Amino acid sequence: MTKPIAENRRARYDYFIEETMEAGLMLTGTEVKSLRVGRANIAESYASVEGRTIKLINADIPPYGHANRFNHEPRRHRTLLLHRKQIDKLIGAVQRDGRTLIPLKLYWNEKGLAKLEIGLAKGKKNHDKRETEAARDWQRDKARLMKGDRGD
């Protein structure tokens, strides 16, 4: 996996990520060109079940600068490309267990194809977020203390 095009850093703060999966994206030519330039935002996006497919909603891929009037719509719904068993598993988890599908990372794979890492997630309550923050602060303080002990 190469350097990410876009990353949803807030997802791990707001959700418990239970499982991750790699999905392809059905994109138009100008969307691919815009991604090659490195322009995308998946911070406010989510994946939703529409019939027997899963769509990426609210992901922002800005219009390609050198395109003509046939440019794409920036926030259109994009179909995720997954195997049927994966789709059925995700649909079951979303409908039965009340889970959410959150995009975590958008990147190019080794073959040069745009891939999206999606997470099957459960929402965190406010007290869970505080616990996560406290644990992160403790890890940071512990690392500082250990660093201070090395120099003596």
UniProtKB/Swiss-Prot annotation:
Chain residue ranges for the region called Disordered: 122-152
Subcellular localization(s) per the UniProt record: Cytoplasm
Alphabetical keyword list: Cytoplasm, RNA-binding
Pfam families: SmpB
A GO term from the CC aspect: cytosol
Family annotation (InterPro entries): SmpB, SsrA-bd_prot, SsrA-bd_prot_CS
Biased composition, class Basic and acidic residues, residue ranges: 128-152
Gene3D superfamilies the UniProt entry points to: 2.40.280.10
GO biological process, one term: trans-translation
GO molecular function, one term: RNA binding
Principal localisation: cytoplasm
S-S pairs: none
Record HAMAP family: SmpB
Xref: NCBIfam families: PRK05422.1, smpB
Family: Belongs to the SmpB family.
General function of this protein: Required for rescue of stalled ribosomes mediated by trans-translation. Binds to transfer-messenger RNA (tmRNA), required for stable association of tmRNA with ribosomes. tmRNA and SmpB together mimic tRNA shape, replacing the anticodon stem-loop with SmpB. tmRNA is encoded by the ssrA gene; the 2 termini fold to resemble tRNA(Ala) and it encodes a 'tag peptide', a short internal open reading frame. During trans-translation Ala-aminoacylated tmRNA acts like a tRNA, entering the A-site of stalled ribosomes, displacing the stalled mRNA.
Protein name from the UniProt record: SsrA-binding protein
Organism encoding this protein: Caulobacter sp. (strain K31)
